[in-house]
Amino acid sequence: MALDAVVEDILATSKSKVAEINAETEQEVARILSEARERAAEIKSRKEAEAKHDIEALVRREMSSANLELKRAELNVHKEVLEQVRIKFLDAVTNLPKDKNEALIKKLLEPYDLKDMKVYSSKRDQAFVSSLVPNYGGTLDIIGGVVVESKDGSVRFDHSYETLARDIFNAKVKEVSKLLFG
């Protein structure tokens, strides 16, 4: 019977050791699982934050792009309207009544000592301008106004209606735009 007691003692010790090893293993498994869950939660949280940030950045880029496109379209409409205003202005200047056209041409010639200059005009204004100036240079392809040039051609002052309209328009484009579009 002593052998049975030894066997039972060994079995009891073995069961105790197995139970102890199982308990340690379960604790180790629980610790590893807990750490894995924590890391998974951290990774998930980080990835969600990255995804949220990426989505917000994408939305900002898309909004910025859409706003830029809208401003471009708006600018194109403004340019078209301003061009229509410029064309109407040129049309109005082209169709000035004869007396107003002649008065404007005289005003354009006032600052110059015409005996030392050649003056060019449109074909329409040829008779009037040639009667005003001692050195008529001929006609140019302009809608109206005059071009004054030194006799040697080194200095030229372009007072054609097209150039005056362009210069006035360029100088006043901000004001015109503000009046038209607020």
Curated annotation (Swiss-Prot):
Matching Pfam families: vATP-synt_E (PF01991)
Major localisation: membrane
One record GO biological process: proton motive force-driven plasma membrane ATP synthesis
Localization per Swiss-Prot or TrEMBL: Cell membrane
Domain of life: Archaea
Keyword Ion transport: yes
Alphabetical list of InterPro entries matching this protein: ATPase_V1_Esu
Keywords annotated in UniProt: ATP synthesis, Cell membrane, Hydrogen ion transport, Ion transport, Membrane, Transport
GO MF term list: ATP binding; proton-transporting ATP synthase activity, rotational mechanism; proton-transporting ATPase activity, rotational mechanism
Name this protein carries in UniProt: A-type ATP synthase subunit E
GO cellular component: plasma membrane; proton-transporting two-sector ATPase complex, catalytic domain
Entry keyword Transport: yes
Recorded family membership: Belongs to the V-ATPase E subunit family.
Gene (name only): atpE
Membrane topology: Peripheral membrane protein
Subunit record text: Has multiple subunits with at least A(3), B(3), C, D, E, F, H, I and proteolipid K(x).
Main function: Component of the A-type ATP synthase that produces ATP from ADP in the presence of a proton gradient across the membrane.
